[in-house]
Amino acid sequence: MNNDTNITTGGKERVAQAADLYQHAFRDDPVISYMLCGLDTQQRHDYLYEYFTRLNTAAALNAAIFEEADNWASASVILPPGKRIDNPWTLVPAGFFQVLWKLGFAGCNRMLREYEPAVTAMQRQELGDTTHFYYLFAIATREAARGRGLSSALIRKLQQRAADEDASVWLEATTVSSARLYAKLGFKSVGVVTLGEGVAAPDGSKEQGGTGVPVDCMVWRPGKEDHSE
């Protein structure tokens, strides 16, 4: 880990700050564009702060770890072992059903009946029935701060935490560039889930006959992949 990177850790008090960063960093994320298919580009951009506020709140209610680097130039949201963001007991207080309402029928179907089951199946195929793994729910860096290794520093800190507990780390890479970064940090691709085959382009936009949106499921295991500089 880069010892020059200042990283701080917190919890639910950081929901809004993380949402503010993510609304910009994920403006054109392919999976989010695909999920929010009922909104045009401007509507989607305008909605992202609320979207991430709801999701971050659901994560926080499940003991998520919020870490930031260099005064919120980069941030991650991490679910500890045994915790899930789709816990039904916390979705209601998080206001998640407002997200489902905004998604509309098609968006709900894509999130709940397409994305979640496919990723969960891949997860179980690779990790079995164990819940002893960290889930890197979200990580992003502000555009002006990219190229400084901030996301890498956050991930290395997570890897050290996981290694101390002999736990794996799971994530889903939604872009080629992010998958490349994770691979450099020792994550192994265990399979690609393709969303919207025949109806979506790789960037998440609508396209009849499109090849769909690829999501690279990846895992890191302590002692098997290097997380050093």
Language model features with spans:
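Eukaryotic N-terminal low-complexity, Ser/Thr- and Lys/Arg-rich leader segments
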Residues: 1-6, 12, 223-229
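A short beta-loop-alpha structural element at the N-terminal edge
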Residues: 5-24
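A short helix-loop-beta-strand connector motif used in the catalytic cores of GNAT acetyltransferases and
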Residues: 46-67, 74, 131-132
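Conserved acyl-donor/pantetheine-binding loop and adjacent beta-alpha core of acyl/acetyltransferases
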Residues: 75-142, 196-211, 224-228
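Conserved acetyl-CoA-binding loop-helix of GNAT-fold acetyltransferases
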Residues: 141, 147-160
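Conserved active-site alpha-helix within GNAT-family acetyltransferase domains
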Residues: 152, 164-166, 175-199
